[in-house]
Amino acid sequence: MRQKDIYFMPLGGAQSVGRSCYYLRLGQSNILLDCGLQRINGATCSPDFHSLLTSQFMESMQQLDHVYISHAHTDHVGYLPQLMQMAPQASVYMTLQTKQLAEYRLIANSSQTGAAEASRLLSNVAPVNYLQKIKQRDYTVTFFPAGHIPGAMMTLFEYAGRKILYTGDYSLQSAFGLDGCWLPDDLEVDVLLMCALHAKQPYSVREKNTLPQRISEVMSNLRYGQSVYLQAFDPGRVLELLMALNREMEQSGQVYPIYLEPEAMAAVHVMESLQLPVLQQNNYSSFYAGAAHPHVVIGTKRKEQVSWRYRIFGNAYTLHEDYGEMLSFIRRLNPRQAYLVHCAEGYYGHTVEQELMRDAQCRTQVVFPEEGDIYTI
C-alpha cells in the first residue's frame, strides 16, 4: 500500500438496499461509514466483516479507529451495538438527534437485555454538530446537514490534498420544517461516495410515493371531511408520519385529531423518554367510537380490519431523492469520481452513468462498486 493512497471497500449495501457499511482507509486510519443490518425472512444479515479482516488492511476489529453514522435508519445503524462490542476502542460519531433516534430504534427492536446493552454502548457515542470540524491523526472531517430525516449528516473528509464526501441518505428538498441537504457553494469534491437509491431507475420521480405527497393526500381528505387510517407497521414510520402531520397542521393552521393505536403510542412514549418531544395537543393515546370525523388514526391494522369509514393509506413511501435530483447533485459537485452505493435494482438497463457520459461539462467517472471488492481512489 502506498502511503497517500485512499482505499474504499463496501461491506454491505453496495448494489442493494440494506446493511449499509463501507470501509475507508485514509493513511493509517481505518474508518467505517455506517453499520446497518437487514432482516430477510426473519434472518438478520450483517456487514461482511470477514472480507475486511482477510484483506490487507485489518486483521482484527481492534484495529478499527473511527465510525461515522450518517443517520438513524436501521439499514445504516442497526448493527452498531454489535460493532461497538467487537471494537470498543473505536470512536463513534453521529449527531445528537441521530443518537436519540438510533437509541429508540435499537431499543424497540431488542429484548430487554439487548436494549439495556444498546443503551449502555450508545452512551459512549460522541455527538457532533453540523459544520463542526474535527482533526484526526491522518485527516480532517467536517459534518453537513443531509436532510432526509432529523439528524442526518453528510461527512466530508480532507486527506492528502483531496476531499472525499460521503452523503449517506440525503434529500435536496425541504419538507415539514426539515431543510434539505446543505453544502457550501464553493465546495470542490474530488471523490463522491454517494448513497444513490435510484441511480438505476431513470423513471423515478420524487412527486410519486413520497412522504410529502402522502401528507398532502391525507390533508386533502381531511379537508373534505374524510377520516384517514395510516398503516405504520414499523415504529420509525409511526414517528415519521406523526411528526410530519403535526408540522403540516401547525404550519397550515388546519388542525385535526390524531389518534394513536397502542403499538403506535408505545413508539412515541419511548421517544419522549429519550427527551425527544413528539406529541402535540391534538394527539391522543386511544381511539373511541364516538370520535368526531374527520380525524386520523395511525396504527397497524390490516386493510380488512379497518372500518369502511376510513380512507386507508399503506406503509410504502420514500424519503429519498429521485433520479433527476441525483443527476443535478452530481453535476453540481462535478467530482473526479463518484462511487454509487445503496442502489436499488434497475429495470430499464439505463443508469446515471450513461446520462453523465453524454454531458460534456461533467468530468465525473461513475463506479458501481461491488461488496467485498477493494477500490484504490
Where are each of the predicted segments found?
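Pre-active-site segment of Zn-dependent metallo-hydrolases
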Residues: 14-19, 26-69, 73-74, 78-90, ...
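Active-site neighborhood of phospho(di)ester-bond hydrolases with catalytic His/Asp-centered motifs
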Residues: 32-35, 64-75, 80, 93-95, ...
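C-terminal regulatory/interaction regions
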Residues: 11, 16, 247, 285-377
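Hard-cation-handling environments
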Residues: 212-307, 341
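A short helix->loop->beta-strand "cap" motif at the edges of active sites that frequently abuts
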Residues: 29, 87-91, 224-226, 253-256, ...
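Core dinuclear metal-dependent hydrolase active-site scaffold
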Residues: 1-62, 129-179, 295-296, 301-303, ...
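Functional cores that coordinate and move charged inorganic groups
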Residues: 153-244
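Metallo-beta-lactamase
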Residues: 103-152, 274-294
